[in-house]
Amino acid sequence: YSSAASPEEGGYALSSSSIQSLLGVLSSFFNYLIQESYLESNPVSQLRQKSKFIRKSQSQAQIRRLSPLQWDYVIGAAEKMAANDPAVHERTLFIMQALFAMYLRISELVVTPRWTPQMGHFRQDTEGNWWFLTVGKGNKEREVSVSDAMLDALRRYRRSRGLSGLPAIGDPAPLVHKTRGSGGITSTRQIRLIVQKCFDEAAYSLRKEGFTDDADRLGEATVHWLRHTGISEDVKHRPREHVRDDAGHGSSAITDRYIDVERAERHASARNKVIK
């Protein structure tokens, strides 16, 4: 604890999911003690009123994402930065576009011991469709379908680096290059700083134009919100199975969390209720 004073009692509370996880860990520990003959029974399994500790929610947690207005200002900020300093910020613009349009995680843009993202991981199939190969969460390899707009973004980025319009098979050029030195970016912290710069510029513009609430909420945003935003927008008009596979979700149930049509309709039906 950083302060000289002791933490205030009651200043922190575990969430229901944290309590549930804690009970699971304790239950496993007590089962081990039973196997080693230290205990005869598992006290956690004897908690008949677990609902006393775990709050059940009627609805699922809301996905943290940018609003259409916030995204317009964020990508607009990246475009302005690229126009003012292309040597540095054409890369910034590409990063923002890739995180949003291909639902990439931050770890999928940087060089790691398990994967080195390269230009050659953009591939064209025999039908002329472009795909991006990546290795994501759980060390799972997946192909992401590449839209025409993302292909245009790729062409622009490559030309800013003095490369041909689209990559050839096996192109070893790093996907996200260092502006100083050679090779690809290896630090997720550097990507976070790049994205945060766009968020800060967008928040400044939003506040300047009177969108104070949107600017304040943008202050809470993280890099991962861009992935959530891209998925949330696409699931409105793409088959959820297609979005699921591009996002690398383990099941359609995860993708379903991004569909808020029923929630919007529910609120719309309540909007004009009268009290008196």
Language model features with spans:
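Basic, Lys/Arg- and aromatic-enriched nucleic-acid-binding interface segment
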Residues: 73-106
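DNA breakage-rejoining catalytic core of tyrosine-based enzymes
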Residues: 54-76, 139-149, 165-172
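Short, basic (Lys/Arg/His-rich) helix/loop patches that form interaction surfaces
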Residues: 83, 192-245, 252
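N-terminal core-binding DNA-recognition domain of tyrosine recombinases/integrases
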Residues: 1-61, 81-84
